[in-house]
A protein has these predicted regions:
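Acidic, glycine-rich loop-and-beta core segments that form the ion-binding/anion-interacting portion
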Residues: 217-305
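A general structural motif at alpha-helix termini
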Residues: 60-61, 217, 262, 273-275, ...
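Conserved helix-loop functional segments at active or binding sites
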Residues: 146, 183-186, 190, 219-226, ...
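A helix-coil-helix interface module used to build multimeric assemblies
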Residues: 1-203, 208-214, 221, 277-278, ...
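Glycine-rich cofactor/substrate-binding loops
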Residues: 2-38, 99-100, 267, 282-446
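Short amphipathic alpha-helical segments with heptad-repeat character
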Residues: 119, 123-130, 134, 141, ...
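Generic, well-ordered alpha-helical scaffold segments in large soluble proteins
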Residues: 42, 63, 67-70, 92, ...
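Alpha-helix capping and helix-loop boundary segments enriched in small/acidic/polar residues
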Residues: 105, 110-113, 157-164, 168, ...
Length: 446
């Protein structure tokens, strides 16, 4: 069995080991590729300051590339008795290269190593989330344009209120995603700073070149203060979680709308039959399980910032093992949100809308405000017009036109989808994904 990196003469109690390692081996598989990338940058820097020879660097880089390929293929495993991904990589290098493999940890602690891994993993995941959000955004904008002239009831307090349109409905969620992407961009900028070189949280007496590793890894800048670099553990995850929760909040609300509008009592939209499920007892059922599960998953994701906060909020400066637990709730969250985005994008592209909803007599009063406004435009004081229409409704004498006259920005007749699309493009252009991709490919020689 492999010896722990920190193990000396005292044998570790097996129950203590099981408890302290917890789910780390499982969670660290998310980080394997990124741990290798971080090590490649670190040893390249070590060679530049004389702690590795050029020949040692070449041997280590070649073997790290092999480990990276194994991780890409899903073949990387953390062996029993090995605590984490960092220990496993060092063990594999030492088995293959002997004492050379033992040199890669110079000037580094597992504290800054895992923090680096988390940042490399997170920024890659943010890129995938941003791309998925952008895909959903474009579907919603296209549907908004396609159905911009199709009216639907607008509700307040779940009571019939005023005319709306499918153009407004689809477009509203598109614009909500723009604001969500602002949160994601802020999270990315916080994430895209280099903590490597902070070691255990107090730096190193080795003459490390942190600017070099920042460049090699494609970070925008450093976490300069080594104490703050470690204080950022938990804070970075929490702020990214806020961004994920913001997106999840939009998707959850959209899922609720879709479930409700798909029901027979509303009948505004129809989900594709192949996206619904049946009942074991009621043969007529077509249940919107996909959106119900999406709603639940997104509601769970909205609790993520609070979970992280409760783990990290009462810790003083310095590293504490409490932070390990954050990985268990944080790392799987990205795939869960990506799944929800993928399902929502597919269904929103295929959803059918009822183009004749307002022909139903129960929506007669939805045009009352239009009638009030018509009278006001003709010169009647607004309050008098409001009272007249209200009395007509009470007396059962209300008559109306189904024409709507909304021309201001963002209304039924002027959706401003081009402006909303421009806002989204501005946010998308603000992510520096290209820099990180170029840097990582250069390290891998691809």
């Amino acid at each position: 069995m492999a010896q722990k990196l920190w193990e000396k003469s005292v044998q570790v109690n097996k129950d203590i080991e099981r408890f302290t390692v917890g789910h780390d081996r499982e969670m660290d598989l998310y980080l394997a590729k990124h741990d290798v990338i971080g090590s490649m940058a670190h040893i390249t820097m070590l060679e530049s300051i004389g702690l590795l020879t050029k020949e040692e660097l070449e041997l280590l880089l070649e073997e790290l590339k092999n480990i990276y390929v194994a991780a890409e293929k899903g073949e990387f495993v953390i062996e029993d008795g090995v605590e984490d991904v960092h220990s496993q990589v060092e063990l594999m290098l030492t088995r293959k290269l002997g004492d050379i493999g033992k040199k890669i940890h110079s000037g580094r602690s597992r504290n800054d190593q895992v923090l680096l891994d988390l940042k490399l993993f997170t920024r890659a995941q943010i890129k995938e989330i941003a791309e998925a959000v952008e895909q959903l955004f474009h579907v919603l904008i296209c549907q908004s344009e396609r159905f911009k002239d199709v009216l639907m009831p607008g509700y307040t307090h779940l009571q019939i209120a005023m005319p709306s349109s499918f153009g407004l409905w689809f477009g509203a969620y598109a614009e909500s995603l723009v604001d969500d992407m602002l949160f994601l961009q802020a999270a990315f900028k916080m994430c895209n700073r280099n903590p490597l070189g902070s070691a255990a949280g107090y730096g190193s007496s080795f003459p490390l070149n942190r600017t070099m590793t920042t460049r090699l890894l494609g970070f925008d800048s450093l976490n300069y203060n080594v104490v703050y670099a470690q204080m950022g553990r938990g804070k970075m995850e929490r702020n990214v979680a806020f961004a994920l929760a913001s997106i999840a909040g939009t998707i959850s609300k959209l899922a609720f709308d879709a479930c409700m509008f798909n029901s027979q009592n509303f009948g505004f939209v129809k989900l594709p039959d192949d996206c619904t499920t049946g009942s074991s007892i009621m043969p007529h059922k077509k249940n919107p399980d996909v959106f119900e599960l999406t709603r639940a998953k997104c509601n769970k994701l909205q609790s993520l910032p609070q979970q992280i906060m409760m783990i990290a909020n009462n810790l003083p400066s310095g590293y504490f093992r409490d932070l390990q637990i954050i990985k268990e709730v944080f790392l799987p969250a990205f795939q869960e949100l990506k799944d929800c985005l993928q399902m929502t994008t597919y269904i929103m592209n295929e959803i059918k809308v009822n183009e004749h909803i307002l022909n139903d007599d129960k929506y007669l009063l939805i045009f009352s405000v239009e009638e009030v406004n018509r009278l006001a435009r003709e010169g009647m004081p607004f309050r008098d017009a409001y009272k007249k229409v209200g009395l007509d409704i009470e007396a059962g004498n209300f008559s109306h036109s189904k024409q709507v006259h909304h021309t201001h920005e963002g209304s039924i007749g002027n959706l401003c989808n081009d402006e909303i699309s421009a806002l989204m493009q501005e946010v998308v252009d603000g992510f520096n994904f290209h820099g990180m991709e170029v840097a990582e490919k250069a390290l891998l020689g691809r």
